[in-house]
Amino acid sequence: MEIITVMHTARSATIEIRDGGRHFTRSPYRVVVNGQEVMTTEKVITSLFGLKPQTAYQVEIYDGDRLLGSTAFTTEYEFVTLDVTRFGAKGDGLQDDTHFIQAAIMACPENSRIYIPAGTYRITSLFLKSHIRLELEEGAELKAFKDREKFPIFPAMLESYDEQDEYNLGTWEGNPLPMFSGIICGVNVEDVIIYGQGTINGNASKADWWDNPKVMRTAFRPRLFFISHCKDITLQGVRFCNSPSWTLHPYFSNQLRFVGLVVENPADSPNTDGLDPESCKDVEILGVRFSLGDDCIAVKSGKIYMGRKHKTPSENIHIRQCLMENGHGAVTLGSEMAGGVVNLTVEDCIFRHTDRGLRIKTRRGRGKDAILSNITFRNLTLDHVMTPLVVNAFYFCDPDGKTRYVQSRDPYPVDERTPVIRKMTFENMTCTNCHVAAAYFDGLPEQKIEEIVLKNITISYAENPKCDVPAMSEGVEKSSRRGMFVRNVSHLVLDHVSISGQEGEPLETIGVDKVEVRE
């Protein structure tokens, strides 16, 4: 067994227990820090808090009395701690603590900590600055007010003085549109870590954010955590809940880490995606537990205006050791992906009770820069996922989503509006209690999916499966226990793929140029 240090700050650390488990370890283990037992863990990704700065730590993992492995690190330097209660914050659940906490943030020097002790701190929007560490103690809650008139507004676009360029702030579902600023918000900042065992609560279940969710009222709904044009940002350990819309939304940002978080929203809350990196690069999502009302992770890169202008894909995304429950899709690409998604890997994760496992949503009109390339899913456990694998090039989003141009299965000319799906690989996946279909791959007839490789995949069905549509597009009929449907693919490889218990044929193909079956 290998034990590694994933990250450490002056006050915290995260270790990874590599015992072959996915999200959960194979057994509960004792965690001993500098000779003192501090916890029992069942998580592959385990975080430690309450550490001291500039201190050497030895972390040992035991199965009973048997030492399995260890790792060592020295915590970082810390200059000073700024306790927000010394700036006037009360944490009594009544006072508006926004300005007091913001004062501590703005006064914080480099290599220092903003400390939020236990209590309930009512806030509107807090704005981050560069080179800070913000800790939420166990029992600390940042709880948003429900009154929308209290929140600042980010304009969609501001024109430059010379009228040659523009400055984008607000965004909504892939377009530059006015929005309320995030509850936690950062613009053009770098080197920030937010960590701890506390909670950031959007309080949307007590507000009207979820009423008429697609209607802009003054501005579009805020995100719980929003960063724009930032780099070197880390979130560790914190619980995020009750978001007004998308929960964590990094936008045109790079070098991001999301480690050991909990992201929770009610199952019926609209558009409360868990984590949506949009036109972001070098993103690690590690050991996060999602349970919410929409897609757990949705990787995006804007609609066609932003895709054409900025040509910024989401790239180098690594998702591992996560638990994704109760969402529409576990990992979704799109539908706003006009800038493309390149080099995405999902591994060692568990998907439970989601409508779909992998979910690719695209359509005509996303544009020629909407390229999906080098997408890999491996070493995954899926249980009670309605349809484990879905690639849908006819997604009926947007006002024109049900027009003939978007929905026609007849070939259209390939032009600057036509998206591209290249190679996707799925390997070492066990899918049990499937309901609707084993897989549903539906490419464009004029721009076929270039290659799909499935290797070492087993799929079986629930005893009493639900009947539903495998993909959101026109003409797709409801089904249950359907096999694998593949349409408009240039090259399909089935390498040790087992589908058992389906009704009808295990494989239906239409417009597939080449099929390789290896047993």
List PLM regions with ranges.
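Extracellular/periplasmic carbohydrate-active domains that bind, remodel
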Residues: 1-519
